[in-house]
Amino acid sequence: ESTGTMTKRLEAVKVPSTPENRLLFRETLFSASSMTECIGGVILYDETIKQESTKKYRIPELISKMGSTPGIKVDTGAKILAKSPDEKITEGLDGLRDRLKEYYQLGARFTKWRGVYNITKEHPSKLAIHSNAHALARYSALVQECNMVPIVEPEVLMDGNHSAQDCLAKTSEV
């Protein structure tokens, strides 16, 4: 989980969100014996993939020892799309090749990138569909070049006042 999400979870139980507490939580989670029963892969964040456990090995090593495959979220978030202020473009391509090489060395074997689309009568626009598809394609090519598997997530948000048929039509466009 991201540092922000982890902070919310820890603060909800009155635990300070320090790097040490986040590490202890993750280490406990990833070393649970039941993890091997149903978790085939774990998507990590930059902080997590670089953390060293209290037993002096990195979190990806712990995940691998438990029989799962470590992966990494590599996009840097969705920002407002130029010329379409109501839509988003996912960023993170700058410097991605170097980050992917580092993540592979740290144990990642797959990656995740999310493109977000909102549904309205006008959206997603052709511009948003094309821009995010282009970014997803570039991301995928770089990941494969670095010997990892890309997870491509074009996420069409279902929020809003539209019918299921409109949602299906917009999702099909994407």
Question: What is the meaning of each model-derived region?
Answer:
Residues 1, 114-115, 154:
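Glycine-rich, histidine-containing beta strand-loop boundary motifs that form or position
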Residues 77-81, 116-123, 157-161:
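Conserved radical SAM core fold
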Residues 125-134, 163-174:
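Short, electropositive alpha-helical surface patch
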